[in-house]
Curated annotation (Swiss-Prot):
Protein name: Putative choline kinase B3
Assigned protein family: Belongs to the choline/ethanolamine kinase family.
GO cellular component: cytoplasm
InterPro entries per UniProt: Kinase-like_dom_sf
Gene, per the UniProt record: ckb-3
Organism: Caenorhabditis elegans
Lineage top rank: taxon: Eukaryota
Cofactor(s), by name: Mg(2+)
Gene Ontology molecular function: ATP binding; choline kinase activity; ethanolamine kinase activity
Length: 368
């Protein structure tokens, strides 16, 4: 644990050390309005919900501008990527203002808002707003590698899984009732699946590469108190990927309920097989994208239907991604008591259940 993280995590938030450091940040990045603030006038509170970083809201009893301190847990490479992404979105008004960055984190604008919950993203009107917001982000050109990352991360995860001693993986889900999966699968067979799905994706959708969030769960969406506008946050996992993968990741995550009982997740089969907002979500996306590009389409319904098929094609791939990633995490010593392997089995069961649909879409679109 590095010094800044250790300071804020290892001490009481009303300790002299924490309050003084927060005051120093205010003076360093916001200048005069914080220079006359006394340490006794500063309050630091933790913002809950950050999975890959610690977040703290810093205020004072004066009129000085409040701010958020975001202290990263990741390595330097991912931290640098997140800073670049955040700065670009901030400049375009698609996120909080960036006040400054420092080793291990950044200081940003505090946006009075609420974080969406799972039930919120299942609401049709909110789902439409999310669909309409996506193209604003997908339209941005970000100066990072344009190579698609999802399948490469799967391969890297399986390589690490094998290096940690992992072998053939038994599939016996305890929550979902899908039965199309094999009883077990080898690393070799998983890599074959990855290669095949990557080929299908390239054949069909190579012209849809955009900058993707890759993890837009409800907890990564803010709704501003002032306007009701939605803001996507936490871009540390962002990279270029296929558009449909990004959309399917968001939609598929809306069917995943996280809890404290083993295996830690419940994947809702009805929401997986018959997502209620898919049509409305895709309609809003197409309408927003056309407006951004200045297009007047004569066949909106065709565009919407194509996007729906695109999302359905990538849907099982998101579950394959999480299965491979979680298989690796499950072998880390610190995770052994969490039983992450059980979650990987659930995701693999969903993958094999939906895989045939992706194959049908591939064959149909390949004929056209």
């Amino acid at each position: 644990m590095k010094p800044i993280e250790k300071l804020f995590v290892g001490n009481s938030l009303d300790s002299v050390a924490v309050l003084q450091k927060a005051l120093d940040f205010g003076i360093d990045f916001l200048g005069d309005e914080w220079k006359n603030v006394n340490r006794s006038e500063v309050t630091v509170t933790r913002i809950l919900g950050g999975q890959s970083n610690h977040m703290f809201h810093v205020t004072s009893s004066t009129s000085a501008t409040s701010f958020v301190l975001r202290i990263h847990r990741e390595g330097q490479s991912q931290f640098d990527t997140d800073i670049v992404n955040f700065a670009i979105f901030s400049e375009r008004g698609l996120g909080p203002k960036l006040y400054g960055f420092f080793e291990e984190g950044r200081m940003e604008e505090f946006l009075p808002s609420v974080t969406l919950k799972l039930n919120d993203v299942l609401n049709t009107e909110i789902s439409r707003k999310i669909g309409a917001a996506f193209p604003k982000y997908h339209a941005i050109n970000v100066p990072v590698s344009k190579s698609r990352r999802c399948f490469q991360i799967m391969r890297e995860s399986l390589h690490d899984y094998q290096a940690l001693g992992g072998g053939d993986f038994a599939i016996f889900p305890t929550v979902v009732t899908y039965s199309e999966h094999p009883k077990s699968i080898s690393i070799k067979d998983l890599l074959t699946e990855i290669d095949l799905l990557e080929k299908w994706s390239i054949d069909l959708f190579e012209n849809t590469l955009v900058f993707c969030h890759n993890d837009l769960t409800s907890s990564n969406i803010l709704q501003l108190n002032s306007t009701g506008e939605l803001v996507f946050i936490d871009w540390e996992n962002a990279s270029y990927n296929w558009r449909g993968y990004d959309l399917a990741m968001h939609l598929s995550e809306a069917a995943v309920i996280r809890n404290t009982c083993p295996p830690g997740i419940v994947i809702n089969e009805e929401l997986t097989d018959n997502p209620p907002n898919l049509q409305a979500f895709c309609e809003a996306y197409v309408d927003s994208e056309n407006k951004i590009k200045g297009l007047l389409s004569s066949n909106i319904s065709s565009q919407v239907n194509s996007l729906i098929q695109e999302c359905k094609f990538f849907w099982p791939i998101t579950h394959l991604f999480w299965a491979c990633f979680i298989m690796k995490l499950g072998l880390f010593e610190c995770n052994r008591e969490i039983k992450l392997n059980a979650q990987a089995r659930e995701h693999l069961a969903v993958y094999f259940h939906l895989r045939s649909r992706s194959e049908m879409i591939y064959k149909k679109l390949s004929e056209n």
